[in-house]
Amino acid sequence: LRTNLFKLCLALCLTVGVHTALFAQTRPDFTGVWQLASPPMTSAQGYPELDLTPAGQRKVDAYRSLVDPVGDSPTLWCVTHGMPEIMMGGGGYPLEVIHKPDQVTLINEWQSETRRVFLGDRIESSESIFPSRQGYSTGHWEGEVLVVETRHLQEMVDSRFPHSADTVITERFSLTHDADGTPRLVADTVMHDPLWHEAPLSYRLEWTPSPLGWMQPYECMEERWLERLDELATQ
């Protein structure tokens, strides 16, 4: 009897394991170097419209009063874009995606700004997470769609999309193909900030494979250091 029960349990485990493996194989692999299918978003082409609440507008106005008179910006100080702007292809820089079973890593060529999407057991407890410009991203699968939720974002007034620390960004990543077979990475995104935004911000981003197929190194601080050396040499 014990032998028969053992065989039955083994058969069930193997069946579940094979089913899990086959299901995992149906999930798309987003690995690759991608570029936006349309030109990078600019103010001329039209960013998604964002309506600020009075509280959000006061925060942004206070920030603008500091930087506008001197023409300063975080870019001049090599500050990374953060979410959600990192995904919008500013400057036309490509995006590299490294897809593993427990983590999806997204690297923007500009400043090598990096996001990590943790899956399954990789997810940390809230107590161990510090707010940041990129936030903390976790993901789960809904069929062939990877649903990514980003929380723990720090308050940002210096972004094209200013937001409070209560912001939650949800992205739904999927893989489609054009008529000629060209793969297309799609991210349907919703940004929700109950404190600073009058309504959720929704938009779609699409990428196709980068013709170059790899990314150039980018070191913002080194360039500023070389400029500083030139200044010292002329003094």
Kindly give the residue locations of the regions a language model identified:
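N-terminal secretory signal peptides that target proteins for export/translocation
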Residues: 1-7
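Hydrophobic small-molecule pocket/channel-lining residues, especially in calycin-type beta-barrels
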Residues: 24-235
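Bacterial N-terminal signal peptides
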Residues: 7-21
